[in-house]
Amino acid sequence: MSSDLKQTPLYQNYVDRGAKIVEFGGWAMPVQFSSIKEEHNAARYEIGLFDVSHMGEIEVTGKDASQFVQYLLSNDTDNLTTSKALYTALCNEEGGVIDDLVIYKLADDNYLLVVNAANTEKDFNWILKHKEKFDVEVQNVSNQYGQLAIQGPKARDLINQLVDEDVTEMKMFEFKQGVKLFAANVILSQSGYTGEDGFEIYCNIDDTEKIWDGLLEYNVMPCGLGARDTLRLEAGLPLHGQDLTESITPYEGGIAFASKPLIDADFIGKSVLKDQKENGAPRRTVGLELLEKGIARTGYEVMDLDGNIIGEVTSGTQSPSSGKSIALAMIKRDEFEMGRELLVQVRKRQLKAKIVKKNQIDK
């Protein structure tokens, strides 16, 4: 493995725990600690802990910070409060998704954008390029933050025992600042990438290992990127670089809820997104279940039963929860019909599949 890969503060901790390390977005990350299935099931049915410190953090501050983040982002950032975050997209002029991200309003003039690891530098440069007309400062503060995700149906009860705040009523994307966890000061966000209840914990980078080790003392399973991918795919959650790209809009990529082109404020890509909201996008993302043995991989062709190509697989795996072969695929809008049978070209075979809901959590 290349020695110039970036490492999170927990890299040596993974190695000491015997994790299998892989390259991901320029980072050396654990793909698994025990087995992907064990880790998947821990987060789906019990409780699992992920190191997501490779994610990027970009801070926007200054007098025009609120207007600037609205200009950059496709969702309505007027809905933000200092306790309510927002999932949104950074779009180009054609409405394509440069990145999907979560934005936190830390104060009236201070916003934290949490972006995908592989896109941090690209996003940062895009944001800098567009700040000219705004009185703002933009900083890449990724090297100041550690980030952990504790996920699963038992995560809330554990966190409630460990922090100095009541988290029992926290709803999706609500967050609290200044929470004490193992004597460290953290931002606690009710969010995640698994389709389960849970929290994302933002801490000073120097506190990351203390919190990680502290949580693992409570019979919590460490989980790697392999389980993170199968969990998010079962939940129908998109991965940027596969299900979302700079040539896929929020309406095509299944995140229409993150686009609000009817608001008064202008933002980059608004005219294209307004047209797609009103008239429909040319393509749409669907869930697939393969009806024959095989795995639908990214880029595999999707055809109608006559063999006409109508789209392609964007992500696919075997579901550890159900054992079924599941996928997300991008198809022409007019070809969509729930339950419809299609074909997927898996190597030299054409396998039958059917259109199902994107969220395929089976428990």
UniProtKB/Swiss-Prot annotation:
Transferase listed as a keyword: yes
Any one GO MF annotation of this record: aminomethyltransferase activity
Keywords assigned by UniProt, alphabetized: Aminotransferase, Transferase
Catalytic reactions of this protein: N(6)-[(R)-S(8)-aminomethyldihydrolipoyl]-L-lysyl-[protein] + (6S)-5,6,7,8-tetrahydrofolate = N(6)-[(R)-dihydrolipoyl]-L-lysyl-[protein] + (6R)-5,10-methylene-5,6,7,8-tetrahydrofolate + NH4(+)
Protein family membership: Belongs to the GcvT family.
Protein name: Aminomethyltransferase
HAMAP family assigned: GcvT (MF_00259)
This enzyme's EC code(s): 2.1.2.10
Main function: The glycine cleavage system catalyzes the degradation of glycine.
Enzyme class: transferase
Subunit organization: The glycine cleavage system is composed of four proteins: P, T, L and H.
Lineage: Bacteria, Bacillati, Bacillota, Bacilli, Bacillales
Pfam families assigned: GCV_T (PF01571), GCV_T_C (PF08669)
Domain of life (superkingdom): Bacteria
